[in-house]
Structures are given as structure tokens and as C-alpha cells.
Amino acid sequence: GIGTSEETKLFLQAVLRELVKSGKQLPVVLDADALNLLAADESLWKLTAESGAAVICTPHMAEFARLAHVTVEQIRENRLQLAGQFAQEKNCILVLKDATTIVAAPDGRICILPVGNDGMAVAGSGDVLTGTIAGIAARLTDSFLAACCGVYLHGLSGEKAARKKGNAAMLPTDLISHLGKVLK
């Protein structure tokens, strides 16, 4: 990943400040080390709030544990409630990645998406999901719907790739190559 150095934190702050200055309410998808930076520095959340952007966070369980200051076990016991509560508290759209992904919006909407397979639990798969959501969010005005569509298409791509290659042999590039096919 990009890392969590002071330089990276300054870069994220600069991006968020530019959003604030622009006055445009653009969707922003945050994943991986951006989430780790948010977990470590509450002031970054204030910038996301000031930006007015539709912030979409895409953590896996361990990243969400750091963001929400809870344990993975606590999340497993109460995923729906914690996801919804977090989305409301942080005014973000939360995409909680797992075998069944939960998408929660600050307005209380929740979508449960049991699509995909364990072959998708590979480095780079989350990057494909982030890009998929970002691409859809750039075209839709409803960022919650964009996140749900992105998760669904990503999962369908994974299912198609698994049928062709098997779960154990899947790579992120297989997900990308099947995205166009699931859109037809």
C-alpha cells in the first residue's frame, strides 16, 4: 500500500482540504492505508465532514476493528448494528468486506450482499473493488447505490472468474477481466 507515513498523512489531508476548498460534493472512496490513517487520527474525520463529500470507506474486518475501536470478535457478533452505527456516526458509507459484505449508509440504509467467494480474499482484490465503486460513484448521484452496485458487480466477477479458473488460482486481474462480462 501507500503506507501510513507522515508524508502520506499530509497527502491525504491535502486531498481532503482541496475537496473542502472546491465546494464540490464529489464521492471519495477510501481503502487500506487511508483507513489506517483515519483510525489513527480523528482530525482526518473532521476534514471528511467539512468536505461535504460522500465518503465511502471499504474496510475488511481488521481495518474496521481499528476504525471503530472494537475487536474483530465484537464485529462478528454484531456486524449489522456496528456497521450502521459507524456509518451514522462518521457520516460515511461503510462497505464492510467479508464473505457477506455489508454496505451501510448514514441515513440508515443497509444492504447485505452475499456474493463472491473465498478466492477473492487475495491481495489486490480490494483495490479492484475500490476502483469499481469509484467508477460507478462517478456516474451516479447516490453513492450508497454506487457502493452496493460496485460490491455486487465485483462479487459476480469473482464468481465468473472462479468458474473459469477455480477459487485457489484467482488473481485480481481475473476480476477485472470479468467485470465487462457481468455488465452485459
Protein language model regions, located:
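Glycine-rich phosphate/dinucleotide-binding loop and adjoining beta-alpha-beta core of small-molecule
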Residues: 1-114
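Generic hydrophobic alpha-helical scaffold/packing signal
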Residues: 16, 56, 80-84, 100, ...
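Short connector loops/turns at beta-strand edges and beta->alpha or beta->beta junctions
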Residues: 61-63, 153-156
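Short, small-residue alpha-helix embedded
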Residues: 66, 122-153
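Short, charged, surface-exposed loops that flank catalytic or proteolytic processing sites
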Residues: 70-79, 141-145, 166-170
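Short pre-catalytic strand/loop immediately N-terminal to key active-site residues, enriched for Gly-Thr
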Residues: 111-124
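Charged C-terminal helix
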Residues: 156-184
